[in-house]
UniProtKB/Swiss-Prot annotation:
Protein known as: Urease subunit alpha
Subunit structure, as described in the record: Heterotrimer of UreA (gamma), UreB (beta) and UreC (alpha) subunits. Three heterotrimers associate to form the active enzyme.
Lineage: Bacteria, Bacillati, Cyanobacteriota, Cyanophyceae, Synechococcales
Note on how the cofactor is bound: Binds 2 nickel ions per subunit.
Species assigned in the record: Prochlorococcus marinus (strain MIT 9303)
EC numbers on record: 3.5.1.5
Domain Urease: 131-574
């Protein structure tokens, strides 16, 4: 006779199943399980008196015969493609299966074979996401990496050489010498990394030199002179070498207006940083570029979401980052021209419409490297409160039960979409078979704020951990700490370094003595907004030059600043 469990008891034992709902952190965002790949009555769970024991859930299969290295049991996966309950099998640092784990000798329908060589991670009651990708990094200090990792970020792309004045303002690692040193520094850092060369030049030689030196992309920044000639030159090099171009446009409109920049881009693929403009760009209307089909528009997190503090904090940040002098009226006017409540408010809504595709940090250069995921879901919460359910969620025939479509839209902004934009989606950016096992486990009450466990290349690299002298792992003080994969020779095989294909073909990794796997970026020049998952809307965006009001397809985009946010002071003292 079948044994029946109360739904609440089942969720507490094996995690939620199809139709169960949960709140994320202290937000108004509700997740509902869409499908359960496990089998009722055949669930696997580790522990005393539990299932994963010899001859029961654990088979006799060796690793050579197909047993996985690690199984994550009964995990609730939140990804751009769905929200499902499943077991996850890891092998050789990659995801090899998502489905049902167990012992095929006694159970049918097993996708993931558990053997004597298999480690178990309890996913029951946890949400699993792909490690986030921060694609707007100023590499000002190496301590950023630990802070980002502690927040659930496992890949960082950007530029810099340390706290140089140029790096403080621009995401560029200029020249072959600096690129080489940063690639060598990456060897000791527990993070997937890639570096952008400086793209500001009107002739190609110096740009080609940087791509051959290992740059995985090129960055155009107004502080180096983002002129139409530089834009055209940079894109021509990128097209030849298949690397992405990121752009911070001309706030002062000295070399041209937004129309001139669009003309210089000429329909070629480009990743526009802080597309709203507070982080920099043609004032006051750079935001309109998000309606171009070849543009991959992103935000940086200081404007995410629009709150009563947003405008006030921006002026001082901007003066410091861009080496401006408050005693010079022109410098103050430059700063003030970038900060507009109307465009920041519209940015919230454009994210909710899927017209902005990516969110990143702008680390220590007007952005906070440890808050990418937090601010992404704070924006989703604010839009749920102010705009209600998305039409796709409201269309559920059972009524508005969940925010699944909104959640899939926002998780894509920090995972798969930056991966696609930068040609690394074959390896990272989603919870899919074949991808690197860069996974983050969250307790639902701490989702987006503090990961419970970060897995990097199939090994635990960061975790919440208690007193090391305690008799069990849980006594306080409990806080995030680096784990074994972050140390010694385990670090190199757990992480990737992204380079241009041209650099790899010249045997650059061996010339520099690199031990980490060096992976080429691919397919960056034939993509567009259409490839941005759940975020490919193309409204016609217009800005009133007098009032700065923003319109999308003729509709005014405006919202109030948030007075209070979730995922904030209930969790964090500072």
């Amino acid at each position: 006779m079948a044994y029946r469990m109360d739904r609440q008891a089942y969720a507490e034992t094996y995690g939620p199943t199809t139709g169960d709902r949960m709140r994320l952190a202290d937000t108004e965002l509700i997740l509902e399980v869409e499908r359960d790949f496990t089998t009722y009555g055949e669930e696997v769970k580790f522990g005393g008196g539990k299932v994963i024991r010899d001859g029961m859930g654990q088979s006799q299969q060796s690793r050579a015969n197909g047993a996985v290295d690690t199984v994550i049991t009964n995990a609730l996966i939140l990804d751009w493609w769905g929200i499902v309950k499943a077991d996850i099998g890891l092998r050789d640092g990659r995801i090899v299966a998502i489905g049902k784990a167990g012992n095929p000798d006694i159970t049918d329908g097993i996708d993931i074979v558990i053997g004597p060589g298999t480690e178990a991670i309890a996913g029951e009651g946890h949400i699993v996401t792909a490690g986030a990708i921060d694609s707007h990094i100023h590499f000002i200090c190496p301590q950023q990496i630990e802070t980002a990792l502690a927040s659930g970020v496992t890949t960082m792309l950007g530029g810099g050489t340390g706290p140089a004045t140029g790096t403080n303002a621009t995401t560029c690692t200029p020249g072959s010498f600096h690129i080489s040193r940063m690639l060598q520094a990456a060897e000791g850092l527990p993070m997937n990394l890639g570096f952008f060369g400086k793209g500001n030049a009107s002739t190609t030689e110096a740009l080609e030199e940087q791509v051959l030196a290992g740059a995985c992309g090129l960055k155009l920044h107004e502080d180096w002179g983002t002129t139409p000639a530089a834009i055209d030159c940079c894109l021509s090099v990128a097209d030849r070498f298949d690397v992405q171009v990121c752009i911070h446009t001309d706030t002062l409109n000295e070399a041209g207006f937004v129309e001139d920049t669009i003309r210089a881009i000429g329909g070629r693929t480009i990743h526009t940083f802080h597309t709203e403009g507070a982080g920099g760009g043609h004032a006051p209307d750079i935001i309109r570029i998000c309606g171009e089909s070849n543009v991959l528009p992103s935000s940086t997190n200081p404007t995410r979401p629009y709150t009563r503090n947003t405008l006030e904090e921006h002026l001082d940040m901007l003066m410091v980052c861009h080496h401006l002098d408050p005693a010079i009226p022109e410098d103050v006017a430059f700063a003030e021209s970038r900060i507009r409540r109307e465009t920041i408010a519209a940015e919230d809504i454009l994210h909710d419409l899927g017209a902005f595709s990516i969110i990143a940090s702008d680390s220590q250069a007007m952005g906070r490297v440890g808050e990418v995921i937090t601010r992404t879901f704070q924006t989703a919460h604010k839009m749920k409160v102010q705009r209600g359910p998305l039409p796709e969620d409201a269309a559920n025939p059972r009524g508005t039960r969940n925010d699944n479509n909104r959640l899939k839209r926002y998780i894509a902004k920090v995972t798969i979409n930056p991966a696609i934009a930068h040609g690394i989606d074959n390896h990272v950016g989603s919870v899919e078979v074949g991808k690197l096992a860069d996974l983050v486990l969250w307790k639902p009450g701490f989702f987006g704020v503090r990961p419970e466990l970060v897995i990097k290349g199939g090994s635990i690299i960061w975790a919440q951990m208690g007193d090391a002298n305690a008799s069990i792992p849980t006594p306080g003080p409990v806080h995030g700490r680096p784990m074994f994969a972050a140390f010694g020779k385990a670090l190199a095989p757990s992480c990737l370094t992204f380079l241009s294909q041209a650099a790899i073909e010249t045997d650059l990794p061996n010339k520099l003595g690199l031990q980490r796997a060096c992976i080429p970026v691919l397919n960056t020049r034939t993509i567009g907004k259409a490839e941005m998952h759940n975020n490919n809307s193309l409204p016609k965006v217009e800005v009133d030059p007098q009032t700065y009001e923003v319109f999308a397809d003729g509709e005014l985009l405006t919202c109030d600043p948030a007075e209070e946010l979730p995922m904030a002071q209930r969790y964090l003292l500072i």
